UniProtKB/Swiss-Prot annotation:
InterPro entries: Aldolase_TIM (IPR013785), PdxS/SNZ (IPR001852), PdxS/SNZ_N (IPR033755), RibuloseP-bd_barrel (IPR011060). The gene is pdxS. In the presence of PdxT, forms a dodecamer of heterodimers. Catalyzes the formation of pyridoxal 5'-phosphate from ribose 5-phosphate (RBP), glyceraldehyde 3-phosphate (G3P) and ammonia. The ammonia is provided by the PdxT subunit. Can also use ribulose 5-phosphate and dihydroxyacetone phosphate as substrates, resulting from enzyme-catalyzed isomerization of RBP and G3P, respectively. GO terms for biological process: amino acid metabolic process; pyridoxal phosphate biosynthetic process; pyridoxine biosynthetic process. This is Pyridoxal 5'-phosphate synthase subunit PdxS. The active site is at 81 (schiff-base intermediate with d-ribose 5-phosphate). D-ribose 5-phosphate binds at residues 24, 153, 219, 240-241.
Length: 299
């Protein structure tokens, strides 16, 4: 059962980081760099996605002591990741007093069928989505923020672009049916394609966007990548491996923050992109075997 007051508070917190950058950090020193660069929040985790992908094995919730050390270091909001479906990890993270939980496909899923019932928590959640159906199902479960899944740990933005365009196309289809008075088609779309309640579909139709903020994530490595996702309609960006796997993390972090805020100013994008050193080498998504793709986890 949804707690409406709590839902409004959770969505309100998510809006507080709108137009900002959330940066993955693995220690207090990186968290300080992120805050000094202007990050809206940090994501505390033991290994960035590039290392999780390279090292393999089962990836779980990070050590609570490490999360608390990062929380003590900075004044900006702190987020942390729980495995898909692992509601006990989420309970533990909530008890730490952090600001948001990411139910993340980057970690090894704990449940192949069920996501966490996010309506049962007071803490807000962010979840990944590849299309409108996935986004609305996570919102129906209680997510206060959506992000593209992209393909984390690659430095290749193509999947994030694909997912954002898919969400936009789904919204355009809903709005088109709604404005033409095609209620039957909307009902069929809600039931068969989106698999969510009609009231959520009508909310999208009236707002002409998702009812929660929608960030970009997965493969963002440069200021231009961040600006690209913002121009596609994202409300902000998550940057994982792209900062601290680059040659000059401090300058790249500042540049990505500037590009996210000034996403529609090509001269600013060009200026902040100068002399940043080498970007993370990355992996072409096309070179990754299908069974190793992280974005396919949790639909």
């Amino acid at each position: 059962m949804k707690k409406i007051g709590t839902e409004l508070l959770k969505r309100g917190f998510a809006k507080m980081v709108k137009h900002g950058v959330v940066m993955d950090v693995t220690n207090p020193e990186q968290a300080r760099i992120a805050e000094d660069a202007g990050a809206a929040a940090v994501m505390a985790l033991e290994r960035v996605p590039a290392d999780i992908r390279a090292e393999g094995g089962v990836s779980r919730m990070s050590d609570p002591e490490m999360i608390l050390e990062i929380k003590d270091e900075v004044s900006i909001p702190v987020m942390a990741k729980a495995r898909i479906g692992h509601f006990v990890e989420a309970q533990a993270l909530e008890s730490l007093g952090i600001d948001m939980v990411d139910e993340s496909e980057v970690l090894t899923p704990a449940d192949e069928i069920h996501h966490i019932d996010k309506n049962a928590f007071d803490i807000p959640f962010v979840c990944g989505a590849r299309n409108l159906g996935e986004a609305l199902r996570r919102i129906d479960e209680g997510a206060a923020m959506i992000r593209t899944k992209g393909e984390a740990g690659t430095g290749d933005v193509i999947e994030a672009v694909k997912h954002m365009r898919a969400v936009n196309e789904g919204i355009a289809k809903v709005v088109g049916y709604y404005e033409m008075g095609c209620d039957r088609e909307l009902v069929q779309m809600a039931r068969n394609e989106l698999k969510v309640p009609m009231d959520l579909v009508y909310e999208v139709a009236e707002l002409k966007r998702l009812p929660v903020v929608n960030f970009a994530a997965g493969g963002i490595a440069t200021p231009a990548d961040a600006a690209l996702m913002m121009q596609l309609g994202c409300d902000g960006v998550f940057v994982g491996s792209g900062i601290f796997k680059s040659g000059n993390p401090e300058e790249r972090a500042r540049a990505i923050v500037e590009a996210t805020y000034n996403y529609d100013k090509p001269d600013v994008i060009a200026e902040v992109s100068k002399n940043l050193g080498e970007a993370m080498v990355g992996i072409n998504v096309d070179a990754i075997p299908e069974k190793e793709l992280l974005a396919k986890r949790g639909i």
